[in-house]
């Protein structure tokens, strides 16, 4: 019986063959998601707007936002999630702090905003969009010398850059913020994870320390670990002197 002669491929030929096979396979897109935990959010007033005060009376300039992505439940099936749909929850530190205080919490309103992604997968620009979200608000009663306040967050056009390398760690959106009779509109950029860049001067006062945003550790300077921020974003991250958080100086091209 004759045997078929098989010529062994050279290592170079094997590599060429492997590349040819892999290039013919489409990589699946990641699911729409958001970094789990806090985002450092910078609020920029839109043209023609007047700044509104934050809860403590200072101009609102930014804060930490909690974002969470989940699959809603299927209709009529309380214990089964629907993988064909995805939703996003946003909770500001301001309303979160109020909601966890038993003396201040407003049971009549939700402290978080909720909206649905347009799709469970990013679009052709690797962007996941949540066009509209429910309003988040809390009413704080007057207590002692403190006046009553009503704070409201209305989010729209929230977009996250989602790729294998950047799994929902950069976001932008529009915010309409109300504090009592003051309402203002802001453009928002957010970066995950939220990292404080608050250092101290010789008198113990909080000051901006840009080194705390560096993703590379520097044990000699007392930084045993890096910031945890993606090193690829280093050129677009800075310590904001107003909110003392490491923030995006510019969103990625996909979110502009």
Task: Describe every region a protein language model picked out.
Residues 37-41, 169-175, 184-188:
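One face of beta-strands
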Residues 163, 238, 243-250, 255-256:
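Long, compositionally biased low-complexity segments
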Residues 1-13:
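Bacterial N-terminal signal peptides that target proteins for export
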Residues 192-198, 230, 249-254:
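N-terminal targeting sequences that direct proteins away from the cytosol to non-cytosolic compartments
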Residues 179-220:
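A contiguous, mid-protein "functional segment" used to position or interact
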Residues 26-74, 81-85, 204-214, 219-231, ...:
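Tryptophan-anchored aromatic micro-motifs
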Residues 56-171, 177-179:
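Predominantly extracellular/secreted and cell-surface proteins with exposed
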Residues 21-24:
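C-terminal motif of bacterial Sec signal peptides marking the signal peptidase cleavage site
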């Amino acid at each position: 019986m004759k045997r078929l002669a098989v010529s062994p491929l050279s290592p170079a030929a094997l590599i060429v063959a492997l590349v040819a096979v892999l290039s013919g396979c489409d990589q699946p897109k990641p699911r729409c998601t958001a970094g789990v935990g806090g985002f450092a959010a910078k609020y920029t007033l839109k043209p023609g707007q007047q700044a509104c005060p934050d809860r403590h009376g200072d101009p609102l300039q930014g804060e930490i936002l909690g974002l969470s992505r989940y699959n809603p439940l299927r209709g009529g099936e309380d214990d089964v999630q629907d993988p064909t749909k995805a939703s996003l929850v946003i909770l500001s530190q301001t309303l979160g702090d109020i909601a966890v205080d038993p003396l201040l919490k407003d049971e009549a309103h939700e402290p978080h905003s909720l909206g649905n992604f347009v799709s469970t997968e990013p679009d052709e620009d690797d962007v996941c969009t949540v066009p509209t979200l429910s309003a988040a608000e809390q009413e704080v009663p007057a207590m002692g010398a403190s006046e009553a306040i009503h704070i409201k967050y209305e989010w729209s056009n929230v977009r996250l850059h989602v790729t294998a390398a950047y799994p929902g760690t950069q976001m932008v959106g529009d915010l309409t913020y109300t504090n009592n009779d003051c309402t203002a509109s802001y453009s928002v950029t957010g970066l995950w994870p939220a990292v404080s860049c608050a250092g101290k001067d010789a008198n113990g006062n909080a000051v901006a320390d840009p080194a705390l945003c560096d993703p590379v550790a520097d044990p000699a300077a007392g930084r045993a670990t890096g910031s945890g921020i993606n090193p690829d974003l280093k050129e677009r991250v800075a310590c904001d002197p107003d909110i003392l958080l490491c923030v995006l100086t510019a969103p990625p091209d996909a979110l502009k």
